[in-house]
Amino acid sequence: MTGLDFSTAAMSIAREIAQSAGVAVDYVESDVYDAVELLGRNMFDLVYTGVGALVWLPDVRRWAEVVAQLLRPGGRLFLREGHPVLWALDETRTDAIAFGYPYFEHPEPLRFDASDTYVETGAVFGCVESREWNHGVGEIITAVLDAGLQLTMFVEHDSVPWEALPGRMTETDGEWRLTEHGDRVPLSYTLQAVKP
């Protein structure tokens, strides 16, 4: 098993978790766009991309090309990600479901300043600048198909594994759903594709 991330801190925590679980994992600290150069082509049976990964990437087409190059023939992409509709919602609004950010991909990132982070920690930071890109469902699926992968599944979900809209969600079995009108907004999706 191989794990790849650009964050030294994330890699350190991942190593601790793997060690405590008794799992052997090779960790590579790198920008995802350099993964093929570091890991080689046609090396993996499975590439897993987790929730929240794509928002850090400016170019989803390039990401899909990297995934396709990493996979062996017959290899599978498994992507569980926050839905672009969720990323476009204004999380500060508590009176209504309202859009506050673009749904479609833009060349320039959205910039956020905050004193918190997505990592569960009690630490308070002075200021954290976050740069994020949203990618619409059509852009993501087209990128995967254009990279030569065959789509085998796409399912939208009414839940996410964190409280994405604070004060407006209820947690059940490790997943958070809107307390009201949960049937109106997709919050995440699962996509699977195979390399022929």
What is each PLM-predicted segment?
Residues 76-118:
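Conserved class I S-adenosyl-L-methionine
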Residues 45-61:
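A short SAM/SAH-binding and catalytic strip from SAM-dependent methyltransferases
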Residues 14-15:
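Conserved SAM-binding loop
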Residues 61-76:
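A short glycine-rich, Lys/Arg-flanked "PGG" loop and its adjoining helix->strand segment in the class I
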Residues 20-35:
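Conserved SAM-binding strand-loop segment of SAM-dependent methyltransferases
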Residues 33, 37-47:
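A short acidic, Gly/Pro-enriched loop at the edge of an enzyme's catalytic core
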Residues 7-9:
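Conserved SAM/SAH-binding beta-strand->alpha-helix loop
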Residues 130-154:
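Short alpha-helix
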